[in-house]
Amino acid sequence: MDGSSLFSFIEAGSSDLYVVPRYKTAFVNPFTEIPSLDILCSYFDKDGNPLESAPDYILKKAHKSFQETTGMKFEAMGELEYYVIFEREPLFPAQDQKGYHESTPFVKWDELRTEAMMAIAQSGGKIKYGHSEVGNFSVGDTDYEQNEIEFLPTNVEDSADQLIKAKWIIRTLAAHYGVEVTFAPKITV
């Protein structure tokens, strides 16, 4: 495969890569009418060596180094915060910088979050819980509603895979709902 189409820092002249599925990441796509299996992949150079600059390989090396240096296991607990961006609704508007663990009708996108959590769990994600967050704000006629999905601790590589799948699921659901999402951590001051 042409690696320059995957990673902007790879030059087209030396961009031959192999994309190899990591079968333990396989999950049934929750959005297709005909069941299909989706799989995360790792990247290898033309000689079959792991691509040094691939994010999953960097994490794998860091994890191994941590274990060798400390003798400890490295687990992570992802907290995926995101904003749903939508046209303001007149009834029960959210208040700026309020809404922590709020419920409907003040939170507009709890259904999207709940659907996302179900799809993430079905794809192998280990979820602790989800809730609305405090970072709500408005600009003109546009509202930004902050939500969070928190994961249970697991080894750092599996935790990263869960977050990759979760972001894809949330973006796909947002497209189905006709809204935008951003995973920017804080977009107001």
Language-model segments: which ranges?
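Beta-rich nucleic-acid/ligand-interaction surfaces
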Residues: 84-85, 136-148, 183-189
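ATP/Mg2+-dependent ligation/transfer catalytic cores
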Residues: 1-137, 154-168
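Acidic, glycine-rich loop-and-beta core segments that form the ion-binding/anion-interacting portion
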Residues: 159-189
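Conserved PLP-binding active-site segment of the aspartate aminotransferase-like
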Residues: 149-153
